[in-house]
A protein has these predicted regions:
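Conserved core of the sugar-phosphate nucleotidyltransferase
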Residues: 124-248, 268
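Conserved N-terminal catalytic core of the sugar/cofactor nucleotidyltransferase
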Residues: 1-11, 16-23, 27-30, 35-132, ...
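A conserved hydrophobic position in a structured secondary element of the catalytic/binding core
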Residues: 63, 115, 186, 208, ...
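A short acidic, often aromatic-flanked loop/helix-cap motif at beta-alpha or helix-coil junctions
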Residues: 41, 89-94, 154-156, 187-189, ...
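Left-handed beta-helix
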Residues: 1-3, 208-305
Length: 305
C-alpha cells in the first residue's frame, strides 16, 4: 500500500470575492482565510475534510508569503515542513509542481490528492468516500491521474466542465471513465448541451501517484519542470528560500487546468460524484446561492439584497 499524501492549495489572492469577504473581516484577505460559510475559515474547513481520509502529518498546505499575517496562527500550529511558502503567487501549476517535488523527495511511491482551499461541500463524509475509492483505483492503475467530476444540477457557465468517454469501470454507486476533453466556462447553450450528454463539473480535486503526476507535468511543461527540478537539492535546507525566490522571479504565471490538464487528457480519468452539495466559492453569486440552498441567513445575503 502506498502512503497517502494531500496538498491543499491556499496561495491564491481571491480578488473576485474581496468585496464580499471585506464585509466579514474588514480587510482584503483572500477568501481561504475567511469564514465565508459557517464559523471557520474555508481553509480550516478544507483541512478538516481532508483529515477524514489523509493524516494531517502528510498534508502539505501551499501559501503565499504576502498573506503571512493571515496564516500566522496556522504556521504556529503545524510543523514548518508542512507549510510551503511561495515567494509570490504564480498560479496553480508552480504551486502544484513545487509541492509534488517536495512529496516525491519524502515518499517517492506516494498517492497524492490535490485540493483547492476555497470550495464548499455540504456532505464532507460522502465526498471523502469518493476520495477513498479514487485512491484505491489509482493504486490499481498507478499510471493514471483521477479527477473528481461533480454531477451537474444546472447548466453552469462559470465552471469548467469535463467531457468523459464511455464508462470502462462502473459499480452501483461509482463510475470511472477516461477523459475526452475539457470545456472552460461555456456559453449557456453549450453548457445545456454538455449537461444533457452527461458531462461533469470539474471540481479540480485530483488523485494520482506522485510519479504519474510529475510525469504528466513534465510532458506538458518541460521547461518549468526542469527549473523546479534543478533546485530540488535545496528543498528543506537553509538555501530553499533564496532558491525559490530566484526561481519565482524568472517564471511566468501558469494555470494547471489550462496548461497541464487540458493538453494531457490521455493521462486522465474522471470519477463521477453525485450530489455532495459542492460549490466553488469563487464568485459572490455562488456564495449567495450556497447560503440560500442551506437556508442560512447571513450578513452577506442581507448586504447583497
Amino acid at each position: 500500500m502506498r502512503d497517502r499524501w494531500a496538498v491543499i492549495l491556499a496561495g491564491g489572492d481571491g480578488t473576485r470575492l474581496q468585496s464580499m469577504t471585506r464585509t466579514i473581516t474588514g480587510d482584503n484577505r483572500p477568501k481561504q482565510f475567511v469564514p465565508v460559510i459557517g464559523g471557520s475559515t474555508l481553509l480550516n474547513q478544507t483541512r478538516r475534510r481532508v483529515a477524514l481520509s489523509i493524516e494531517s502529518s502528510r498534508t502539505l498546505i501551499v501559501v503565499t508569503q504576502k498573506h503571512q499575517r493571515f496564516y500566522k496562527s496556522l504556521a504556529e500550529e503545524i510543523p514548518r515542513s508542512l507549510l510551503l511558502e511561495q515567494p509570490v503567487n504564480k498560479g496553480t501549476a508552480p504551486a502544484i509542481l513545487y509541492s509534488l517535488l517536495r512529496i516525491a523527495a519524502k515518499s517517492p511511491r506516494a498517492v497524492v490528492t490535490l485540493f483547492p482551499s476555497d470550495h464548499f461541500f455540504a456532505d464532507d463524509e460522502e465526498f471523502m468516500s469518493h476520495i477513498d475509492v479514487a485512491i484505491d483505483a489509482v493504486e490499481v492503475q498507478p499510471e493514471t491521474v483521477m479527477l473528481l467530476g461533480i454531477t451537474p444540477t444546472t447548466p453552469e457557465t462559470e465552471y469548467g466542465w469535463i467531457e468523459p468517454q464511455p464508462s470502462i469501470l462502473a459499480s452501483v454507486q461509482k463510475s470511472i471513465t477516461r477523459v475526452s476533453k475539457f470545456w472552460e466556462k461555456p456559453s449557456l447553450t453549450l453548457a445545456t448541451s454538455l449537461m444533457s450528454r452527461g458531462c461533469l463539473w470539474n471540481s479540480f480535486v485530483m488523485v494520482g501517484c506522485v510519479d504519474a503526476l510529475l510525469k504528466m507535468i513534465r510532458a506538458a511543461m518541460p521547461e518549468m519542470y526542469a527549473a523546479f527540478a534543478a533546485i530540488a537539492p535545496a528543498y528543506e535546507t537553509a538555501n530553499e528560500h533564496k532558491a525559490l525566490a530566484e526561481l519565482y522571479s524568472q517564471i511566468e504565471d501558469a494555470n494547471f487546468s489550462h496548461q497541464v490538464l487540458a493538453v494531457r487528457p490521455e493521462d486522465l480519468m474522471v470519477m463521477r460524484v453525485g450530489d455532495v452539495g459542492w460549490s466553488d466559492l469563487g464568485e459572490p453569486n455562488r456564495v449567495l446561492s450556497t447560503l440560500a440552498r442551506l437556508g442560512v441567513q447571513s450578513e452577506l445575503a442581507m448586504s447583497a439584497s
